[in-house]
Design a protein with these regions (language model features):
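Short, well-ordered beta-to-alpha junction loops that form the rim of enzyme active sites
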Residues: 36-38, 165-166, 207-210
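Histidine-anchored nucleotide/phosphate-binding helix
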Residues: 15-25, 188-192, 196
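Donor-binding and catalytic core of enzymes assembling or modifying cell-surface/extracellular glycoconjugates
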Residues: 11, 193-272, 277-280
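Leloir-type glycosyltransferase catalytic cores
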Residues: 278-295
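A short, glycine/small-residue-rich beta-strand->loop->alpha-helix junction that serves as a flexible
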Residues: 7-16
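Secretory-pathway luminal glycosyltransferase catalytic domains
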Residues: 45-194, 198-199
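A short beta-strand-loop structural module common to alpha/beta enzyme folds
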Residues: 30-41
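Extreme N-terminal starter segment of soluble prokaryotic enzymes
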Residues: 1-4
Length: 295
């Protein structure tokens, strides 16, 4: 028996899928493989990014994918067909597609070789090995000179707050805007007000895929702040730097989610948007860990 987990999306999504694979293989006491198929449409936009971390990610070969390769080549058709099929879990037990964002314990009950397709965006899938996940996600390469300076600044700041803003694809892609939406200036104003409560002398470290926008938007912030300009090519360093802060404001982004989650401190404060998508069809009650504050 082995499991294969489909990889898709950006770094935050990839981390969820790897953590899910890592956890389910541990629970089922079996091996796992990651399907990072280059024909996957997601990778025309996003790159495979887990190789920046010192983790062993067993990638599926063509031989491993022999019985599933047709799923990838006809992914959209098969995905639609599977969703419409009655008794699909009985007729096709080797294929498991995530139906909602809500934790589904059925995933842990598979008994044969299974191909898993989903985002798995809830800590509940890997909370049992949370400490292991955090300890394993260390960077392969030393920080760049720029990021090292930022880390030193964070470490010298008793009350460092990471603030994440995701804009580029959510604002400029009409499909993403309609489905996902993005956090408003009012959200950030309310989140800042809440996160500094009982916190003397906060210093904000602002991370974003739109550096120019955050520089302009937060110029009147009444607290010391630093806008980080690593860019997409160093987003894994941003993730590490975010985790070094003691409090966090995240956007409706899996990347921001991981930046806050990787902070192992039990007393950390995390402020997150209560609405993750524009559509109300997606149940996200399990997306945010217990204790995170919704605004």
């Amino acid at each position: 028996m082995s499991i294969i987990v489909r990889m898709k999306g950006g770094l935050g999504n990839q981390l969820f899928q790897w953590a899910f694979a890592r956890s389910i293989s541990s629970r089922l006491k079996t091996s796992y493989l990651i399907d990072w198929a280059p024909f996957s449409p997601e990778f025309k936009v996003h790159k495979y990014s887990l190789d920046h971390f010192a983790i062993k990610v067993p990638l599926a070969t063509n031989t491993d994918m022999f019985g599933f390769v047709w799923i990838g080549r006809h992914y959209k058709f098969f995905n639609t067909f599977y969703r419409l099929m009655r008794f699909r879990r009985v007729l096709m037990p080797f294929y498991y597609i995530e139906r909602t964002f809500v934790f589904d314990p059925v995933a842990f009950s598979k008994t044969g070789t299974t191909y898993f397709d989903g985002f798995w965006q809830t800590e509940k899938y890997f909370k049992n090995i949370a400490d292991e996940i955090r300890s394993e996600l260390t960077l392969v390469e030393p920080l760049s000179h720029y990021s090292k300076k930022i880390e030193e600044e964070i470490q010298s700041t008793p009350n460092a707050v990471s603030l994440h803003v995701r804009r580029t694809d959510l604002v400029h892609n009409p499909v993403m805007t309609a489905f996902h939406g993005y956090c408003s200036p009012e959200f950030y104003a309310a989140a800042i007000k809440r996160v500094v409560k009982d916190m003397p002398s906060p210093h904000f470290f602002i991370f974003s895929d739109d550096y120019e926008w955050v520089v302009g938007h937060f110029k009147s912030l009444p607290y010391p702040y630093t806008c980080i300009k690593n860019g997409a090519n160093k987003n894994y360093e941003d993730l590490y730097l975010m985790s070094r802060c003691c409090r966090h404001i995240i956007s409706n982004s899996s990347f921001g989610w991981w930046g806050a989650w990787l902070n192992p401190k039990k007393d950390k404060v995390v402020i997150a948007p209560s609405k993750w998508f524009v559509t109300t069809k997606n149940d996200t009650k399990d997306l945010l860990p217990e204790g995170w504050i919704k605004i």
